[in-house]
């Protein structure tokens, strides 16, 4: 299996689409009104809600790189908890695993 994450592979295989997505995300953030860490924490909350482990893993890693703490990421993932426990059941173990790997 490739050591590249799915986004890296997608970006290489579909560069134009990936670039268009990045531009769309920038516009959705009105050119950067949210700082990067905040934006990434929101993405963690979104993908926790949709129970998408691939995207959630990506954004947890990106949030860590942007300076978010494990607790901040967990808090973002738990916000959707009010719409159902299944989002937390997916998110918290995944966050723990990624944070444990990042510490190595």
In which residue ranges do the predicted regions lie?
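Residue-level preference for alpha-helix termini and adjacent loops
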Residues: 9, 33, 55, 80-82
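Amphipathic, charged-and-aliphatic alpha-helical interface segments
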Residues: 39-53
């Amino acid at each position: 299996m490739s050591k590249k994450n799915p986004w890296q592979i997608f970006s290489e295989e579909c560069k134009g689409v990936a670039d268009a997505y990045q531009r769309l995300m920038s516009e959705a953030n009105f050119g950067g009104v949210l700082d990067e860490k905040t934006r990434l924490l929101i993405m963690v909350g979104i993908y926790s809600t949709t129970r998408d482990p691939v995207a959630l893993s990506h954004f947890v890693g990106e949030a860590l790189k942007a300076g978010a703490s494990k607790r901040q990421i967990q808090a973002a993932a738990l916000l959707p908890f009010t719409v159902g426990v299944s989002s937390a059941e997916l998110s918290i173990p995944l966050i723990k695993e990624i944070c444990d790997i990042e510490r190595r």
